[in-house]
A protein has these predicted regions:
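Aromatic-lined carbohydrate-binding/catalytic grooves of carbohydrate-active enzymes
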Residues: 1-2, 12, 18-28, 129-144
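Alpha-amylase-like alpha-glycosidases and glucanotransferases acting on alpha-linked glucans and related
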Residues: 25-132, 145-201
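Conserved beta-strand->loop/alpha-helix structural units within folded catalytic cores of enzymes
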Residues: 3-19, 117, 122
Length: 201
C-alpha cells in the first residue's frame, strides 16, 4: 500500500502481473481440487475422469493426486490449468463446455481476484497469455467473451483501470480481443501519444 501511495503521489501508475491461465500446485484451490471428495473447487481445474485417461494431445500430470484423474498443465508440472472450459468438447466424459456452470465460476473467480487488487489501489494489469484461457478455442471466440465481460465490469466500476495483453498469437487474436488498452502497435502508439501530451518527463 505504501508503494501505491508513493507512486500515485508522483503521478505514476502501477500495473500488476496477472496470470489467469493457471495457479501454483500449492494454491489452496488446487489443494482442494485434487482431493477425492467433491467440493466447490473440483471443477476449478481440468482433470480427466480417471487416472488411465491421458490423451496425448494434452499436457497431463498422471497418477499423483488422491482424486481419480490426471490434471492438465499449461507448461510446467507446477502450473495446473484453470478450467475456463472447452469451446470444442472432444472428451465429454471430463471436459466442461465453456458456458457450463463450472467454467463460468472460474471466470467469476478471476474477476474476484481482479476486484480485490483494484479495490486495493492498483491501476490495472498486464495479463499473461490473455488469449489462452478457453481450451480448443482456435478462433478465440469464448476467450474473447470472457475478456469482454471483464472489460464491462471494469468500465462500470473501475473506468480508469488499464489492461495490457500479452498474446500467444497476436496476429490472429489482437483484432478479436479488443477489450485491452494495449494489444497492437497501433493501440500502443495511441495510448503513449495521449500520455506524452500530458506527461511530466
Amino acid at each position: 500500500k505504501e508503494l501505491l501511495d508513493k507512486a500515485h503521489s508522483m503521478d505514476m501508475h502501477i500495473l500488476l502481473d496477472l496470470v489467469p491461465g493457471h495457479t501454483s500446485d500449492t494454491h489452496p484451490w488446487f489443494q482442494e481440487a485434487k482431493k477425492a471428495k467433491k467440493s466447490e473447487f473440483s471443477d476449478r481445474y481440468i482433470f480427466t475422469n480417471c487416472v488411465w485417461e491421458a490423451p496425448s494431445e494434452y499436457r497431463l500430470m498422471c497418477g499423483i493426486c488422491e482424486r481419480d484423474g490426471n490434471y492438465l498443465v499449461n507448461y510446467f508440472s507446477s502450473q495446473p490449468a484453470l478450467n475456463y472450459g472447452f469451446y470444442n468438447v472432444t472428451h465429454p466424459q471430463w471436459q466442461l463446455a465453456h458456458d457450463s456452470d463450472g467454467a463460468k465460476a472460474t471466470a467469476e473467480a478471476l474477476k474476484d481476484v481482479m476486484r480485490h487488487w483494484l479495490d486495493f489501489g492498483v491501476d490495472g494489469f498486464r495479463v499473461d497469455m490473455a488469449d489462452s484461457l478457453v481450451k480448443n478455442d482456435d478462433e478465440k471466440i469464448a476467450t474473447s467473451a470472457i475478456w469482454k465481460d471483464v472489460r464491462n465490469m471494469m468500465d462500470k466500476n473501475y473506468p480508469e483501470a488499464a489492461l495490457v495483453a500479452t498474446l500467444k498469437e497476436p496476429s490472429k487474436t489482437a483484432a478479436s480481443i479488443w477489450t485491452f488498452t494495449l494489444t497492437t502497435p497501433e493501440t500502443a502508439t495511441h495510448v503513449f501519444s495521449d500520455f506524452l501530451k500530458t506527461a511530466r518527463i
